[in-house]
Design a protein with these regions (language model features):
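Short amphipathic alpha-helical interface segments
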Residues: 1-9
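Key DNA-contact positions within bacterial/archaeal DNA-binding proteins
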Residues: 27
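Beta-hairpin "wing" of winged helix-turn-helix
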Residues: 40-55
Length: 143
């Protein structure tokens, strides 16, 4: 998503190009864009100039909505990931308030970070060679 955000609005970018730029496998990217397209966060375009594009301005996306589209719940424990806490132990669970507090902090943070902010951290498209900095797919510049 951050890679798409660096382009002009409406610009379609191929997964192959993103794969090469971010040093991620094409198969992995396909697994990521499927749920994003399903909920309308990206739009796919077919054809020789095909690829994916954002459906709104990068400032209008939050990291939270992107993560939830891809991962589902971001709750730290399963019983907080459902609308109704169906855990039979919830009334006796002495750690539930801790997990609920952590869940609240996580959600507040990821909902406060925009795609525009994330994309601003990417190196310029024509910068020096990049390599993956970790399994998250982020990049770092080689010096």
């Amino acid at each position: 998503m951050a890679e798409l955000a660096r382009y002009a609005p409406g610009t379609t970018v191929s997964l192959k190009e993103i794969s090469e730029r971010q040093n991620l496998s094409l198969k992995y990217l396909e697994q990521i864009v499927t749920p994003l397209a399903r909920v309308g966060l990206v739009k796919s375009e077919r054809g020789s100039q095909g690829g994916y594009r954002l459906t709104k301005d990068p400032a209008d996306y939050t990291a939270g909505e992107i993560l939830r589209a891809i991962e589902g719940s971001v709750a730290p424990i399963p019983c907080l990931g459902s609308v109704t806490n169906e855990c039979p132990m919830s009334e006796q669970c002495f750690t539930l308030p801790f997990w609920a507090g952590l869940d609240e902090v996580i959600n507040q943070y990821i909902d406060s970070v925009t795609l525009e902010q994330l994309a601003s951290q990417l190196p310029a498209p024509d910068s020096a060679a990049q390599e993956s900095c970790c399994s998250c797919g982020g990049t770092k510049n080689e010096k």
